[in-house]
Amino acid sequence: MDGETAGEKGSLVPPPGALGGSALGGAPAPGVRREPKKYAVTDDYQLSKQVLGLGVNGKVLECYHRRSGQKCALKLLYDSPKARQEVDHHWQASGGPHIVRILDVYENMHHGKRCLLIVMECMEGGELFSRIQERGDQAFTEREAAEIMRDIGTAIQFLHSRNIAHRDVKPENLLYTSKEKDAVLKLTDFGFAKETTQNALQTPCYTPYYVAPEVLGPEKYDKSCDMWSLGVIMYILLCGFPPFYSNTGQAISPGMKRRIRLGQYSFPNPEWLDVSEDAKQLIRLLLKTDPTERLTIMQFMNHPWINQSMVVPQTPLYTARVLQEDKDHWDDVKEEMTSALATMRVDYDQVKIKDLKTSNNRLLNKRRKKQAGSSSASQGCNNQ
């Protein structure tokens, strides 16, 4: 670990007029708003240069609580109304089921600028898809996918019950607490979250591969955005590739927007051949293009595939093998999405829609060519 130098420690100082205080505050009860601590975060935490991740509004660093030695994650946000909103929404959700906990928040000066520092529990188990990729030959089953979706749904249910829309539910924001088998999956990064009771959600900010159709145009949107994202994540969990693709190398192409708007996707074989009809039906209900027809979170949680996950078939899926084979591509996709997160403010009325006849799922075509060249490819599922 790289400890902070005296210079680094000195760069994170209390704002003018701030008073000292004590150590690790622990997570507040869900929904409780607290004021940031005004003394230096380095009084309580030893900072590292190790970057754990990049959020929508700031990077996340490794840190250690000085008294307990507890390893934590520190997110630095330069103070702004947007940053305050992120802290507020995450604080309201912190302590909820399957949501990353906030331990402390500080208001300090960094390089002469006021900033907010969010200390969170460290999610040492890594991202959802990385964990599945690393399984090797161990089969990933439909029942496991159902259990994962139930956990994600539990987090969304908690947020929606408090009239918070997350608006950026995606695999990269779903992290495990540890590498252990009993690790808990949790949702993080509230950089795009908004309260749905104050005003209609009209800001076109999102990660393109998991965006609901109504976000792609001037229509208002709400919690149903999160339900659409659940459908996309569920689709990927069950086969290893997303239902919608950009064919141009852009983060989001006109053709991809068109397919999302029209709800154009399929369940191609062999990856979907043995997946249950219940699972496919649930995906169809989540990917409805009309938000008023899409399932609510309560309906999702009450669907048999979710609330009776113990009777979901333990069918081996292609998911782990597909994710492993396309690992380099998935890293590229994630980079595209990360770079697009804060900048996607598109005037969709000005975009020329690409002819669907010229649109192909290039990743799926690539997989099919590989399968055609190997007579054993169609048996891959049985060898996981």
Swiss-Prot record:
Family: Belongs to the protein kinase superfamily. CAMK Ser/Thr protein kinase family.
EC number(s) on file: 2.7.11.1
Provenance organism: Mus musculus
Record PTM text: Phosphorylated and activated by MAPK1/ERK2 and MAPK3/ERK1. Isoform 3 is degraded following phosphorylation at Thr-203.
Motif Bipartite nuclear localization signal 1: chain residues: 352-355
Listed name of the protein: MAP kinase-activated protein kinase 3
Gene: Mapkapk3
Region (Disordered) residue spans: 1-33, 359-384
Modified residues (Phosphothreonine): 203, 315
Tissue: Ubiquitously expressed (at protein level). Isoform 3 is expressed in skeletal muscles and heart.
Oligomeric and partner information: Heterodimer with p38-alpha/MAPK14. The heterodimer with p38-alpha/MAPK14 forms a stable complex: molecules are positioned 'face to face' so that the ATP-binding sites of both kinases are at the heterodimer interface. Interacts with TCF3 and with polycomb proteins, such as PCH2 and BMI1/PCGF4.
Cytoplasm listed as a keyword: yes
Residue numbers covered by motif Bipartite nuclear localization signal 2: 366-370
